[in-house]
Amino acid sequence: MSYSPTAENFAKSYQKDIAQVVWTTLVADLETPVSAMLKLADGRSNTFLLESVEGGKVRGRFSIIGMNPDLIWKFSREDVFINRKARTDSKSFEKINDSPIDSLRSLIAESSIDLPEGLPPMAAGLFGYMGYDAVRLSEKIPDNNNDDLGVPDGLFLRPSLICIFDRLEDIVTLVTPVWPKSGVSSEAAYEAATERLSAAVSDLQRSLPFRRERLVGSKQIDEPLSNTSREEFHEMVNTAKDYINAGDIFQVVPSQRFSIPFDLQPMALYRSLRRLNPSPYLFFFDFDEFSIVGSSPEILVTLRDETVTLRPLAGTRKRGANTEEDKALAKELLEDPKERAEHLMLLDLGRNDVG
């Protein structure tokens, strides 16, 4: 098996204290992102799978698996924690005396790697989420809600193994980032990197792990429970209208959280969502104490080569019974003044945020 770069070229960058990646490429026409996730993760925590689906039917070009983080960063309210021993102890967090935004900016700069030409842009870096409550880091918004979930407001992993599926080329690229460490020679660092890649290749070549566990849940499905009553939700909507009429706000999203018992593995929920949901972007994060499973109909924002791209969606219609009805509904959406105004508002909001 061949690895890139060569040990000689790796040593040249390593001795200059330059972070870099080591990678290998395999043919992947018989593998899927889900099967690879099951083989590579195999019950490990702090793993993730990001998939793109074009049009809800045809799998998109890139899907990404990440695992074995060497570093985990998280924050709750104003408290920031980092674990630089994540490979050996996933709970070894230390508190940082810095703001969440400043510490994350520093970590992004620390984790930045100039990738060789030809590698996808997601071949190294930080992967995770920022929750809605993170808005309070930049806006003075009161927080009168109880923290009844107890999950971090933001959490990012720095995986030491990244598996990138390229459906256009039918290949999978296995990547391991390497940050120079004092006392570790370039030879030892390169050997460790190639061993990580070799182990991943072996995992991909084996059969799917067999477990004696149920693949379907109970036939009796409980009714979802909301965290608010119908009357309370109506009052929230009326209050929002009052704020809009008073000129205090011009957009708000009233929400409620539904909960239901789930006795299967989180991956089972993701697989069901993947099959049934038409949204083109799906994500699965399996952390130590909780998991996040979801999908999105839009990219929303992309930053690449110093260019910010906003692609907000607005306006919905029920799908037509045939192609002709779909085209008519699409034309109706494009000509609807209300939908056009909402698009312009979302673009203005995005421009304001970027500015």
Where are these regions (language model features)?
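Extended alpha-helical targeting/anchoring segments
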Residues: 1-355
